[in-house]
């Protein structure tokens, strides 16, 4: 039941096919109560909306969206959605709400390591933050990033401001799930990926030459479980080393180190199950 639109959604199959129906009579009282609570919450964050609520006893759908949007921006509203990505149930509704009500990338600001505020605007110097690294067949190492500011174009030269290393992005891809589409550019607020970077790994900022923009690193949880690992045979040691290198690149919470005292390769992670899955 969607108490914002006051509709009952029925999903016929596992392909996300949705049928919009009237709310059943036996559920209407509960739905109206929840909608009233939603209206009151939306009105809390704006004086004009509060006045309309007192005058009319209710708010329109657009006014509710406006109030919820203000609440999200102030940190007073944390929307929760029930959905299934596997069966594509509720995903479309989540996307609708995100587009119409949630914060636009253009409204966000990021703070650099120096404490400077960088707005997510196309006219600002270009900067990207790499939040994930993957190793994929036929592509090799793939770096996923968000364009934090400016306009990224194919062939653009960027630098890692922390090391001074230069990087040319020869290929840029827009990402939609597992699908990648080669594009000539991306602008502030968009997410994309590129391949085979030298100066850019997970948690690294690449920014316009001379801009000095470097964002704070993601703080990953410390490892809680350690175990020794070895190859089944001496011939497999090279393969094991390559596999461990790929795993640690994809998952920064996996740490691989060699203990001189124990003369063993030590693998650290969040728990036994975490290590087993890797």
Annotated model-derived regions:
Residues 1-278:
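Structural and coupling elements of P-loop NTPases
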